[in-house]
Amino acid sequence: MKKSSLLFILLIIFLSCGYKPSAQYAKKLVGEKVYTEVDVSLSDPENAVLTKDALNMALQTRLKRRVSKSKNADSSIFVLYKDIRFIPLQYDRNGYVVFYQAHITLDFTFKKEKIVEKRKIVGRFEFPIRPSAIISNDLRLKAIEKGSLKALDEFISYLSVKGLLLDEQ
């Protein structure tokens, strides 16, 4: 009885204060159909494919939006790789790097009618390696993918806040 009463009170509090999940504001700003484009870096073409897939997946799973062609889209998101760096974080007793942090700098541009939002976001991902080992290609790609996902999540959060601010106007 106490559990159901507490749940009922919490439900009333959330409904009466007008609470909306932040994704609702991003959905409203983005629209139903979104065109996505990721600039392919000639030095790292695999990363563009991973980022485009991650962006499309994020739009479909987090915002429940469909990816469409440019002419049918309500809005567009463009992503450009600016910089990819690996920074040593920790060394062992012999001076070998045992922990790295990947810094993936992405430039995002969101366009919808007259609204144009540009944002430079750095996604970071920490990962260990064996002492005296070089960063393997698989580990490198995984770190870039995870760092890109973190940057995408941050950009979606930014769109939610932007949608909230536009909704209040």
PLM region descriptions:
Residues 2-9:
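Sec-dependent signal peptide recognition
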Residues 4, 14-60, 161-169:
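A structural "domain/chain start" motif
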Residues 27-31, 72, 95-101:
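Short coil/turn motifs at beta-sheet boundaries
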Residues 43, 47, 51, 98-100, ...:
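Extracytoplasmic/periplasmic, Sec-exported soluble proteins
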Residues 51-78, 82-84:
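N-terminal, post-signal-peptide region of Sec/Tat-exported proteins
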Residues 66, 76-142:
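Surface-exposed short loop/turn segments
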Residues 112, 131-169:
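C-terminal/domain-edge helix-coil "capping" segments
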